[in-house]
Amino acid sequence: MNDTLIGLAERVRQAAAAKAILRIRGGATKQSMAGVISDAATLDMRSYAGIVDYAPSELVITARAGTPLVELERVLAERGQCLPFDPPRFADADGRLSGTVGGMVAAGLAGPGRAAVGGVRDYVLGLLLLNGRGDLMHFGGQVMKNVAGYDVSRLVAGSWGALGAICEVSLKVLPMPPATTTLRFDMRPADALESLHAWAGQPLPLNASVWWRDTLAIRLRGAHAAVAAAVQKLGGEVIPPELGHAFWEGLRDQRDEFFIEARQAAERENSALWRLSLPPTTPVLPSFLDTLIEWGGAQRWIVAGAEDTLVMHRAERAGGSAFRVSGGVGDGAGYATPLAPALLAIHRRLRESFDPHGVFVPGRPMRF
């Protein structure tokens, strides 16, 4: 067994014996969402890094948790492949894109392409997990047909460290699309949602969409003929490729104009950036300071009061949930729609089975 893994497992066993708590650390690019516990020691995963195996012909790559996400994507790009769910690449406090593969899976965050291609958990084939007892546990594998423990691998995606520290992960990857085109339309929000819902029922290579301030942008991806036919059918303004690429990258990494303004507003006044997960058919929600709509209406970013219970109330009434990403008191994030009692009980039982001693302090989205 790798010496670094042995050392990490021993740290966890010592913490369990001492009834101490550990905070799992990767690139520290999501601390505003995860929150910080001052009395928790750090289990730093960055030393366990590197590509373990890559089979381009099989569309599978296995990497250690501390591997920088930008490094993984560079390796894939050299072979014309990618992570199609557009995982955000956030910067740390020093402005570096230091996010890790383990952090990507633990947070389970996806970007503009999520609605079309699926999320992080849909691409996790297997992983090596260090649980709260200090045991290393293998789940899943490196091929789709090897399904032993497959559901557990998916369960870890988006668990924010509640079930243990991800050590290695095998991911399904896809070839880069042959053609990409961005179209722009001038539309009111209700018209944009209506159009997106209509287009979703048609055989169009619609890969991503976003509406903000009466402008709808869509990304078409696929075969050259399919993209060209869709452009002819839908109309709109064709955005030059280099501008379109920069636009979607900014949206993916949350460094475009909307997110910059939202964070500036949160610093100046008692407002916050919220993420709403809603049924796509939910109508426009008025009365917020600013709104950006993604995923055909399923994900909406809004700027509203930091302690605004109306945000959660409206999300719940629509059959969805709300999470405060930044802003508010302290380190800001984490104010969220409570889980239903039955679902909360399931979450707690799962966590107790993987971490019976409560060694790991999960990110705030999974802190009950």
Task: Briefly describe each language-model feature range.
Residues R23-I24, N207-W212, T291-W295, R324:
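Short beta-strand
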Residues M1-I24, M45-G95, L109-Q142, P177-F185:
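N-terminal glycine-rich flavin-associated loop
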Residues V70-L72, A190-S195, A225-Q232, T281-F288, ...:
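Short, conserved charged micro-motifs
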Residues L5, G35-D39, R46, I239-F368:
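Conserved glycine-rich FAD pyrophosphate-binding loop
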Residues F85, R96-P205, S209, L216:
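FAD-binding subdomain of flavoenzyme oxidoreductases
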Residues I24-K30:
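Glycine-rich beta-strand-to-loop/alpha-helix junction loops that act as flexible
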Residues T180, D186-E249, D253:
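A conserved active-site cap/scaffold subdomain adjacent to cofactor or substrate pockets
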